[in-house]
Structure formats: C-alpha cells, structure tokens
Regions:
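N-terminal short leaders/motifs
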Residues: 1-16, 38-47, 68-85
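Non-cytosolic head/periplasmic domains of membrane-anchored proteins
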Residues: 111-181
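Core subunits and conserved enzymes of cellular information-processing
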Residues: 26-52, 58
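Extracytoplasmic/periplasmic, Sec-exported soluble proteins
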Residues: 54, 119, 142-146, 150, ...
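Activation targets extended, charge/polar-rich intrinsically disordered C-terminal tails
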Residues: 2-31, 160-243
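Short amphipathic alpha-helical surface micro-motifs
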Residues: 33-35, 42-46, 73-78, 107-111, ...
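Short, surface-exposed linear patches
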Residues: 73-76, 83-87, 115-118, 148-151, ...
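Glycine-rich catalytic cores of cysteine/serine-nucleophile enzymes that process amide/ester linkages
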Residues: 53-143
Length: 243
C-alpha cells in the first residue's frame, strides 16, 4: 500500500469515528446534562394553577389555561389568528422552534437538507401556538400544579419571547387550531425547542434539567411528580397538530 493510500484510509477511518462518535457524545451529554437539576428543592403545590407539559416525541410544549386572574392569553395571541376560532377552547399550548424548519416542514417528507442544516447551525425562532379543548392527561401530556406567583413568572417569560410588534408577524399553522408568531432567540444544538421549554420552567422556579436538548430530558422531571407518574397513556392525543 502506498503512503498516499495509507493516509486516505486513515482519513476515512477518522471520518467514520467522527460520524459514529459525534452522535454518541451528543446523546451522552444530553443524558448527563438533563439529569442535573435546576431548582432542586422545588415541590409541586397542592393548589395554584394547573398547567401541562406535553410532547409528541420530538417537541415539547407548555399548555396553560386560556384565562386566569394572572393572564388572559387571548390578549397576547388573538384567537382570530386561527381558522377555527369559534370552538370552545380551554387551553393554549406554547412551544418554540427554528423558523424555517417549522414553517417549511409541515410533515417530515417536506424536510430538505438545507432547512435541516440551517436549523442545526442556527436560525431565527418562532412561537407555535395551538388551542385545545379540555385536554386529557396522559403519559405524553402531564399535569403540573404550580403556585400563582410561579405561573405569573412563567407567563412573563413566555410573553417576553414574542418579537417586537413592529417587526414580528404571524404565519398560518398546520391545522385549523394553530398559528406561528415571530419570536426572539436563535435555534442551534445548544438551544433547541426542548431546551426552550425547560428554560421557561426553570426561570419560573420549577424543577427541571440543566441541558435538555431532547424531549425525554424535559419530560422525566414532570414524570417524577407523584400525581403525574401514575397516569396512563391516553388513547389519543389532544386536539392539536401532529407536530
């Protein structure tokens, strides 16, 4: 074997190790990071405001009652921005993600390499808002009861994510009950949609993981709560888009 051929072979071996080792390092780091708690002394309250943390296995979302004495979300997210505005909605779901990925990939079949690369390397954010009617608790849709002050802090955190009115706009959702709004923040591997969820919870004083790029890193902290751990998996998801 020539020197050149040997170098080529070694380069290919190194590239293969990187391709295999990179994802493994990421997954291990995500597991470790999500196992480190923030607000470790926090406990669920017996009263207060009940919210939900939901997942479809890829994304997570924070689901809240439409109106309380703390906030009426219709003042932040006009219900007239969705097609099926006349339905008797009771809850609003909020999640965050990379703008082009969300808007250009209503299904995984629509995903292009360019959109995927842009999402991984850094892209602007959008809020995904979905409206639900009496969502049922399930293994993928877990209730969490927090104090009024914690809810007020959470609401302020979410409101602050909207882009300024003079620069932001709305975009049609995937279904009749959802919509997108321009948001602040940049998406990258260190700041994913699931990290956004845990950061909002942590900022409100709620226990969650330190680095949670994957949905399991968010959900395992809710699952540890006594009144959510025993919930059965629902036979169907809430009335919401698939993503």
């Amino acid at each position: 074997m020539s020197v050149k051929a040997g170098r080529t072979k070694r380069a290919a071996q190194i590239a293969g190790l990187i391709l295999i080792g990179g994802p493994l390092v990421f997954l291990l780091s995500a597991w470790i990071g999500s196992s480190i708690p923030r607000n470790s002394d926090w406990q669920e309250t017996a009263d207060g405001v009940e919210i939900f943390v939901g997942t479809n296995g890829i994304h997570t979302e924070i689901v809240m009652p439409i109106a309380t004495d703390v906030i009426d979300w219709r003042g932040r997210f006009p219900i007239g921005d969705i097609t099926a505005a006349q339905r008797p909605y009771t809850h609003v779901a909020v999640s965050w993600g990379e703008k082009e990925f969300f808007l250009q990939t209503p299904t995984w079949g629509d995903l292009s390499p360019g959109v995927a690369l842009n999402a991984v390397t850094g892209g602007s954010g959008v809020l995904h808002i979905a409206w639900y009617v009496r969502p049922a608790p399930s293994d993928d849709f877990r209730p969490l009861r927090i104090t009024r002050d914690q809810y007020a802090s959470l609401a302020a955190q979410i409101t602050a994510q909207l882009a300024p009115e003079d620069t932001g706009q709305s975009y049609p959702g995937y279904s009749r009950n959802d919509v997108f709004y321009d948001a602040v923040g940049t998406y990258h591997l260190g700041n994913t949609c699931n990290q956004w969820t845990s950061d909002r919870l942590a900022a409100a004083g709620i226990k969650t993981g330190l680095w949670t790029p994957l949905p399991g890193g968010v959900m395992k902290w809710v699952n540890a709560l006594p009144h959510a751990a025993a919930l059965p998996r629902a036979p169907h998801a809430p009335d919401a888009p698939d993503r």
